Swiss-Prot record:
NCBIfam families: PRK05244.1-1
UniProt region (Disordered), positions on chain: 1-88, 147-180
Job of this protein: A GTPase-activating protein (GAP) that modifies Der/EngA GTPase function. May play a role in ribosome biogenesis.
Family named by the database record: Belongs to the YihI family.
Keywords attached to this entry: GTPase activation, Ribosome biogenesis
Lineage: Bacteria, Pseudomonadati, Pseudomonadota, Gammaproteobacteria, Vibrionales
Protein name (record): Der GTPase-activating protein YihI
Amino acid sequence: MTRKKRSRGVGSEGPAVFREKSTTQVDVEARKSQKDKKRKGLKSGNRNAEALDPKHYANGQKKDPRLGSKKPIPLVVEKKPTTKKERRLSAEQELDMLENDAQLMVLLDRIEAGEKLGAGLQKQVDQKLDRIEHLMGRLGLLEVEEPEVTEEAPVRKGAKTDEDLLDQFENMDLDSFGKE
């Protein structure tokens, strides 16, 4: 493949067009491009510099951040009035409140009627009933259910004791098992 020598003559693009600028325009553009090149990074100065707010200025001067608040500080510690804590109800009072709880009674009636409660209501009923049971236990009002004593099952006539089973094992003919 032969190489074509390029000519300097006017090609398909037409003659080159040059715009002449005045020297002042060239100088201005050069200065601008140099400034842009110089300012590639961040501004110099304090990293934590905050934006200037108008409230920092007082009478046209910058407010010194080192000056503190003008709020007076008490030098003597004053005792704060203590608020009275709610008295906890005694176990008897709490038990009376729970037993007379209208909402609990309504929910128990609904359960007895065969209605199924939602998970939240059922959980609430269970918690209140557990609390009532706990309080009754603390007050000694809870009747402890005695487990019923079940009689041991009578020994069947055909049942073998441990000694009988041991004798049977010892008298077994083990040779007859392996010859099948």
